[in-house]
Amino acid sequence: VQASSGMADLMRRATDKPTYAPTILADKLCALTIVYSVLAAVVHQRTTSRGQRVEVPMADTMLAFNLVEHLAGHTFEPAIGPMGFNRSMTEGHQAVRTADGWACVLPYTEKNIADFFRAAGREDLATDPRFGDPASRAKHYGELYDEIGKLSVEKTTVQWQKICAELSIPFAPVLELEDAETDPYHTGSGLVSLAEHPTEGTYRQVGPPMILSDTPPSVRRHTPARGEHTSELLAELGYAGEEIANLVSPVSA
């Protein structure tokens, strides 16, 4: 799906190699699309008393996801430029090294950019016309990110975090997965918690990330063993006890 939707090609444009996203991106994205598609059909059914067939093709879903910004110059007919969102495809559009680690720093507005360069002691870059307006920046993203990368190594991650917070510049230290899980922000929300499985013992579970004021979500069931819900699902579909027993019992040779 990543290959047929252009995702692997986007990775090639960014890394020179058509690699896969390091997560089960298509599965997760299509699952979310299925959820809101089914909910839309439920709303329609409750309004009109009519059901309908819901299809969510994985390749189409991924392609639509990619083309939102990467249609780019092919948005118009005839095309006025290449496909691919220029800023995302620019070399250097990535985390930068600090004096003691890595961080993501993204001065976005003219003020952000000028403030960042002034904080780094580079008044010349703060007033550089290449970065002074959106049209000029679009032609010089590579140089902008290159200059940020050169300056970021002059201070520690904590120093940059403090500076960027004071100047309202988007910034975040790069956390390893292990550190992200135990970061105070995430532990405070209770996103990852310990639970007891009836057969497998203690395990970590990832809870719902959303917050609902009146109906807060929670994890109500443990991670199922293979086939654990088969009988329950068949019963919901209208199968009787004996039919279920025949369906779930091993087939004899």
Q: Which residues make up each language-model segment?
A:
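Flexible, small-/acidic-enriched active-site or ligand-binding loops
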Residues: 196-246
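Aromatic-enriched alpha-helical interface/lid elements that frame and gate functional surfaces
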Residues: 86, 91-167, 171
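Amphipathic terminal alpha-helices
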Residues: 182, 242-253
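Conserved active-site and cofactor/substrate-binding residues in soluble primary-metabolism enzymes
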Residues: 2, 29-33, 107-111, 143, ...
